[in-house]
């Protein structure tokens, strides 16, 4: 599987920080960012982090499998069950979990799946999420671990190296 994307840029006249503040309101997410580099700014929001390292462990939380929320809690629970039963969504999700395991094993040990196919609700979507963890020693080069796991499988596809070659 290859994840294709396109570059998009647009000139904008106005207060981009107000656009960012509006984004925070319409798409509240655990990870929000705004970088002002003088000549250009980058901002966004995401429920996903690439790699987290804390207290001797490294974590990747693959997110694959997404359904739009309806605004009706009962209907959303039904959709969550459909998501868990969907063969295509599950196949993609398991592929990303396996990719996270492989990526973490390059620079860390004792790789394991902490939870698999957990449903998480966000303001506009329902996601299927897993957590893959690995042990890291104090001597682990965290930047090397980041490089070993970059880019996330949700951005590249799998098998990662071949997908990246085809994308390039």
Predicted regions and their residues:
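Extended alpha-helical targeting/anchoring segments
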Residues: 1-168
